[in-house]
Amino acid sequence: MLFRSQKPTPKIPERAPDKICDIATLPQAALIYRLSGDYNPLHSEPAYAARAGFKQPILHGRATFSVAGHALLKTCCGYDAAKFKSMEGRFSSPVYPGETIRTEMWIDGAMVTFRATVPARGVTVLNNGMAEIIQ
């Protein structure tokens, strides 16, 4: 069972982001991600994805989340995993394999508010994100 957190949802600041990081996904990323044990045909079978209303198979949510995490780790932690305490966010749109995910970050001390977008389609794919970084 999944329960939503009682914490207030972080809001994206109304100013330009402090940092931006673009990371491209591989066209075959959804097929590779099946190694995690998620065999949902939504991520691998075009006909199944079309019946679900998508133009093609979509990337796993965990993969989208991990790309945003990679951007945070690279940009805010200098790839020092010991500085990366936690992250959370809300999925808001699918990502298609091969798309570039842009993570925009607003830094306030140890707290980083972020969102991830796919600029080519003009959509936000992960919104109201919050990460805690150890200074």
Residue ranges and their predicted role:
Residues 1-2:
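Short, small-residue-biased leader/transition segments that mark boundaries at the very start
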Residues 5-16:
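N-terminal leader/targeting segments
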Residues 5-7, 24, 40-41, 77-78, ...:
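Short secondary-structure boundary micro-motifs
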Residues 14-75, 79:
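Hot-dog-fold acyl-thioester-processing enzymes
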Residues 20-23, 86, 128-132:
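Well-ordered beta-strand positions in beta-sheet-rich domains
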Residues 29, 45, 53, 85, ...:
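A residue-level detector for conformationally permissive "hinge/kink" positions
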Residues 64-111:
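Hydrophobic beta-strand-centered segment that forms part of the acyl-chain substrate-binding groove
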Residues 93, 100-135:
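Charged, cofactor-coupling segments
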